[in-house]
Amino acid sequence: MRKLADYGRDDHPAEDPERAQLAWTVALLDDCDECDGLRVELTVEEVGSPGAGLVAHLAPATARRLRAALARALREMGEAEDG
């Protein structure tokens, strides 16, 4: 089973010749035979190149660590936390 949680694109201009615009998806995954239990699947790939990206299978603790890192970066740039 793979259940999509959210998807989107980064906010970098598509016309920048030095940096590719990226797409991301976050999903819940339970069919990773090598993984022990449920995983949060994070996929990052260049816009227009579906299937050619990088996929991370994050255990709950690792997903929480990533969430905390994103929250810390937002705080450092002066953004209020949601919720």
Briefly describe each language-model feature range.
Residues M1-G83:
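Positively charged, low-complexity terminal tracts
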